[in-house]
Amino acid sequence: MESGDHLGNLFDDMVEEDNDEDSFEEPACEDSFDSQEASSKANEPQNDSFDEPIQSSVSKQSDDANGEDEINEEVIQEQKELDLNEEDFNLLTIEEVPLDVLTARIRRVFTEVTYRAEPAAIALFDVAHKIIFKSTMLDCKRNTVIDSIIEGLISIIVDERERDQGAEEAEHVLMIFIAKLAIKNKSMKCSDLLYKLILLVDRLYLHADSFVRCRIYRLIACLMEEANRYADVMREHGDDAFLSDEDPTESEVMIPSGVKNRWMGKLAKSLLDKSPEVRCKAVIALSLWDHDIECKTTCCDEVTVNDLLWKSVHDVDESVRVNAARRVHIANENDIDKCIDYVETSKDNRVKQAIIVRLASDVSLLSFSEKQRFRLVNLLNNSDSARVQDVIHQLLVESWMKVAGDEIISPSIFPFPDSDNNNIPKEFPSIILEYLDPLVDPTAVYVFMKFATVRFIQKSTVQQACGSLDVEKFMKDLLSMTIPDCERVGLMRRTTFRLIPKDNNDGNEDIRKIFSRIFISRCFVDVIFNFAKGRLDATHLRSRALTFFLPDVTTFVEHLEKFCDAYFHRNMSTDYTCKDLVLYNLLHLMNVATKYGDLHDDKMLYKHALKKILGNSSFVFSSETILTIVMICFDLCKIGDDVKQLCDWMCDTAKQLMLSHEEVLNLEEAMKNDKVLEQMYLRSATMLLATCKHEEVESPTASMSSLFKTIIPALLGNKNEELQQLGLELIGFATSIDFENCEPYLKLTTLLIQRGDEVLTSTGVNTLIKVIKSQGFPKTANAIFQGEEQTEDDCQDALAKVFEKALVSLQGMALVQSVQDCLSMLSYGRYAWSKLMCAIIMLVFQKSNECLPLVKIFASYCKKSIRSDFNKMNLLLGFCRAVGIISKTGEDDSNIKLLEMTELVCECISSVHTIDGDEVIPQKKRKTDNEEELYPEIVLANRMVGRANSHPSSWIIRHVFTAMATSLRLECVPMKIVDTLHELLVDTYTVVRFNSNKTTQIAFKRFLTHCEKVITLHERMNALKLGVDFKKVKKEVICADEDPKSVSSSSSLGRKRGRKRENSEEEEKIDADDSFELFQYVPKSTRTRIRPTVNVEEDQNIKTEIEDSDDLEDSFEL
């Protein structure tokens, strides 16, 4: 191995990502290591921006003449070119010069590196290395070459001048240059420069200036990175020597282990530095250690480097979090799970984006487990951030498709292609099915396949430069593929479309191939149809896609009937796993073909085929499939008469299905004798349920009413819980359209809710909510409890208790469904139901740690549904009731996130201004009986202040007032009402101050200060009410006896600041203290503070003067 092989290309892979994230400008470095040369160049104009990769010591002079500009450019170009034939840069003459000449030459080298940056560093590295190596060979007490380097580096580090980004980049180039020289010389048993650098770091890493600490940590990062690179190269050299039967030499450790451990401990402590810039540099340097090395923290706990980096991911500063996310070690599946967990739960979009970039760029597709792949792909659908979805789309899809294209040509489920004779395009979209099984999560794979298809079209078309997709060329390329190649990638065309395999050897394997081909065809068709939206040639593109990928509707219907007969027959011996998925995708493609087809009788033909499939009792379908088929049949109806005829047909078919295997012709008699099969019950009831669900069915027909009376009691009385659940759902939809005939079944619903089964309870709650939405709460309550209760109010109270008890008894996804149904009911009508809102709030924030989407559902409800003051007051009363219940438990025993709950409620009930054109219109407020405006923010604040006054030592006061100080907006509340609230807070603070702990006092005082800021804002707004042009006010003549400061502005605030207020006797005795620091033992009361008021007489004089002026504008009127 050559002596410089371990260095590689000097600066190719040195990219400092943290330069863009730093929020401060570091001081500029010294421009030269040679003081004499620096003094000689002091009179010349210099450019210190370091923006260009190669800098010149003479700045460009801008002249008007074109000839002078060309001359200047030629001079600058000559100065940029580095002459390596100079004597100072001649490697052959270094052996024959004394130490003082070597010192002058090394200064010249660093001067050129300073000005010319990376190109000079690459060209002069060997020269600098030989100079340093030669200086260490000389017999002298003081090595002036190394001392010059150290002195120049110190001048860079401790310099406090402000720097721009170019200067920081030049500083980084110098540090890398010095670190590479130190490691290179250490590898040749010459460690003087490295030890000097170690001493410099140990002397300055505890410096008081944060800028100095930042540069020291950057120097540590450069040294560690070069040492790691040398270790990697030597490790590879050792592997090569082992394979070639040579004796591998022992690799020498560049930086002693004791020094590395000492630096690691200091960097770990620096993660808690007060400066975010220092913490950023500490994270970057610490990430260069191995992920599993343990170090001791300030609490003497041993944690790994990766754990410290993950702690920095949760730092308070965003730049620190982003830098830590970019540099966490991803070494195994646990680290990948940790990254995905953070992306799924965090709200910091920049950090999530940085982690996804790491996962896409640094982790191969083959390193992810199947579960991890699906979790990442599901973020394309489930993520709330469009930026995160875009990063996954552009980076993750690109990375995974490249890896898949390098590994395979076609999925293994299809016939393996002949590698020597195939015309399959590289990175065809269907190859991702090898790593993402659509049977596991069809929706996630469908989304990924669509993005992969768009990427493939962009890469294969010629018009990608102009931003459009050439779909015609894409289909022509597919048409050029041979039939065997199409078979190998799962591509079906109109001529090769089939659903029944030719050789039915393995049933499940064949149905998987069919599903994959149909799935791929659906993705291609949907991508082309989405692309055609809004285009002038949309009809042409859709017709081309249908002609290319799908058969005509008549042939398609024949394929559908044959497929159902082959795989859904009752007497089938094999249970096929994915036949329902195949049928669902087939129905989707059939819907597309009939909607955008050319023939007018396609819909009638399609509906007739579906009715034939539904009426065939020998076919066995799942409930979801039956619902889908029935909905499609109603969607294909054109007029209302067709809907009624189809309803009668559905009812008649359901009766025939229940009597299909019995000799009895009377349905009621067959039900009474238990002659109807449960399977036929399920199918008939599902058909009837789907009929009631459709929006076109608004009223029942005679056959529907008759069937309701027959089938609902039979379903509720059946022992099968699935049939009971279906009966409850049917009651809800049937009662919505036929309340008179189905009213008695509501009592049975309440009885089934009280049985204790979670599924039946959740279904019963859903049924009652559907009836309440259609018929109203009083009518529903009377229908259930009219005979048991005396008055209508008692009936409504009884129904309310049923809901509240049922909601509290549920768990898991049944609870999620019921909460969502209850919130939809509350948003649908006006219900003063604070108890139900209290139960929902407590359940949402009590179950927030159980991976249930309750908080997301509740936040969406607050954002979209709570707009009127009535709904705000209902939410407020429910919250206050919940706070009262939570306060009865201890802080350690309570598992409710009170702070998050209060923040969400405060943000929801806070009033905001709405903008209509150029006017700002505040929201209208509901008035009480005393004709006073009601503000929910003030109601909430008064209730919480009253609780603080009655229970000042309660632990909830700290959380509630901390959230109110940051989330409760009072800007829209009139100043008079806020002033009253402020006086109440001042009176209550005395009670809180003497009866609560320090943190509670701080939280209460924060809200008090928040009110004071709002009052100050109102005062300023009142002062700006006068529509006066500021420029004209400045031109007014100032009286000689008037203070200039008091009339410099049109507002009364300037006069108020200029006039000093005399303190009262009580205020002179007490020192004012507005601090919120934790070391303050007892905060002083704000009771004695007197808010400065505006001088009314002076304001009146100014108003009179302004009214007398006719030429004043109203440009500042709010």
From Swiss-Prot:
It comes from Caenorhabditis elegans. Residues 13-34, 1107-1118 have a biased composition (Acidic residues). This is Uncharacterized protein C30G12.6. SUPFAM superfamilies: ARM repeat. Residues 35-60 have a biased composition (Polar residues). Residues 1-69, 1044-1071, 1090-1118 are annotated as: Disordered.
